[in-house]
Amino acid sequence: MCLAGLPTDKDRDDFIFVVLRECTPDKSKQIIDYMLDNMVDIGLVIIDGIRDLMYDINSPSESSELINLLMKWSSEYNLHIHTVLHLNKGDDNTRGHIGTELNNKAETVLQVTKSTQDVNISEVKAMHI
């Protein structure tokens, strides 16, 4: 909010934050689906932790099903979906089969890393566009 120049001391009607941390993957997907189906004019959904919508990030079938669900939501509700998935420790590859599927289907993949010169700064680079 601060980076966008928006006030941080009051709620905004056009931003809705939903915490699904304690929900199962199936329940989280149901909640997202319900919200998309019952709210109007949603233009952007940010899923910080796409891994939390899966039981097994290395399952090819579960990965494909989740990617298909994201694509369905994107098309059906005419919105952009931004997901966050961490990289493998030690290399620049996204984690699990879901990482491979996201890379294959994503419009743009961005990598966010801490600056080597200042740990208080994050650097963003395009892995592919």
PLM regions with names:
Residues M1-S61:
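Conserved inter-motif catalytic segment of the P-loop NTP-binding fold
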Residues L44, D52, S61-I129:
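Phosphate-binding/switch region of NTP-binding enzymes
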